[in-house]
Amino acid sequence: MKKLKINYLFIGILALLLAVALWPSIPWFGKADNRIAAIQARGELRVSTIHTPLTYNEINGKPFGLDYELAKQFADYLGVKLKVTVRQNISQLFDDLDNGNADLLAAGLVYNSERVKNYQPGPTYYSVSQQLVYKVGQYRPRTLGNLTAEQLTVAPGHVVVNDLQTLKDTKFPELSWKVDDKKGSAELMEDVIEGKLDYTIADSVAISLFQRVHPELAVALDITDEQPVTWFSPLDGDNTLSAALLDFFNEMNEDGTLARIEEKYLGHGDDFDYVDTRTFLRAVDAVLPQLKPLFEKYAEEIDWRLLAAIAYQESHWDAQATSPTGVRGMMMLTKNTAQSLGITDRTDAEQSISGGVRYLQDMMSKVPESVPENERIWFALAAYNMGYAHMLDARALTAKTKGNPDSWADVKQRLPLLSQKPYYSKLTYGYARGHEAYAYVENIRKYQISLVGYLQEKEKQATEAAMQLAQDYPAVSPTELGKEKFPFLSFLSQSSSNYLTHSPSLLFSRKGSEEKQN
């Protein structure tokens, strides 16, 4: 999969073209009878989306996601509240536009020649390719030529249907497929890993995130080249919403907000490692339950799951771990660092975790205040790995090479240069293994994504199982299942082998529709 990147050039060109086309409607705040005026009079921006880890998701009741965050900022830009409606599939999204139930679709939708005949696209903000997926261990097709409707199923409204039809007409006359009107792409990927379906097609970003929780999902081949992703709004004579979107994205591009959001949601990399991810998820089941209380106890200012990811990157949750350089323990502390933190036994898991957190907090406190709050942790982790002085060198090098020293996206690209003589010879603190610091932070981010998604899935599986058990045994209510006298989790561990493995996802699907007011 190609590196994901916001298409700034496309935004710039589109801005110029649309500015000319939309010039009569640019002063949209001054009109009383246009789409923007209607949104402001209503006091809310109605956005329809789908539930995926990238577009819209929730943790502890709090919404997040790339499209959600952009939509929230756009609503703030317009001075209105955001109303989010979550639909099951893409067809339902466009129904919302057709029926006047949405102002915008913000759901990672691909720009497509057929779609723009009936709907107004906005600026593009990243790109994806469409890929055929299968389950590891099953037959991997090398071509679409002989795939049949019994093997290949796609979601309703999926843009790839047009591409498949073109391929059938021009290259693979035997190709056939079916559309499942009741399921979205995420649910079809679940069916593939459950063995209910041979193949489906999804976009490369969705697949990459899905694999963090389900490494058994594999890419067979690319169906399309990279395609721009955009929002859609109604296509009519009123261009005020398009003009507002254009202004909004230009402003986000110019002040660096788009780059920061790209790094936040797409910056975890796309170099998926099946064995590493599978090994990590097995450790989540086998080792994490004993360590979780310690991570929760000492996490303090950071999410405990991030702390767990850091510890796994350091030692694979092995309290006895020792490296050739002499660092030891769960958080792999040097002897000098441990002494400065008052640690008497580096191989004691609690002492190591407590000390590691304090050391990380010290690094956090040194990160310049000019660095955005949600990026400070990455600078601190780089400093944790290679030393604070070398992190300062990385920032200085970034500034010298016309990057933004306060942007993690810019700084991390310069980290490998710290080990190259033409660069480190001119830096204050000299040589550093910057490439290792880069990999260190990237790995932690991947482990965190996997852990958050996997724990969410297990929680939902437990809830579903509880409800099913209550139906099977009506005398036991769902609330009773969590009490000591009915050890539900123990029951599950004995009765369901899937409970202790990365079994089919519930994280990536939401049936029906939901509405959230923000």
Swiss-Prot record:
Give the residue ranges for region: Non-LT domain: 22-269
Q: Where is the signal peptide?
A: 1-21
Reaction equation(s) it catalyzes = Exolytic cleavage of the (1->4)-beta-glycosidic linkage between N-acetylmuramic acid (MurNAc) and N-acetylglucosamine (GlcNAc) residues in peptidoglycan, from either the reducing or the non-reducing ends of the peptidoglycan chains, with concomitant formation of a 1,6-anhydrobond in the MurNAc residue
Is this entry keyworded Acetylation? no
What family is this protein classified in?
A: In the N-terminal section; belongs to the bacterial solute-binding protein 3 family. In the C-terminal section; belongs to the transglycosylase Slt family.
NCBIfam families referenced in this protein's UniProt entry, alphabetically? PRK10859.1
Q: What does this protein do?
A: Murein-degrading enzyme that degrades murein glycan strands and insoluble, high-molecular weight murein sacculi, with the concomitant formation of a 1,6-anhydromuramoyl product. Lytic transglycosylases (LTs) play an integral role in the metabolism of the peptidoglycan (PG) sacculus. Their lytic action creates space within the PG sacculus to allow for its expansion as well as for the insertion of various structures such as secretion systems and flagella.
Question: What is the protein name for this chain?
Answer: Membrane-bound lytic murein transglycosylase F
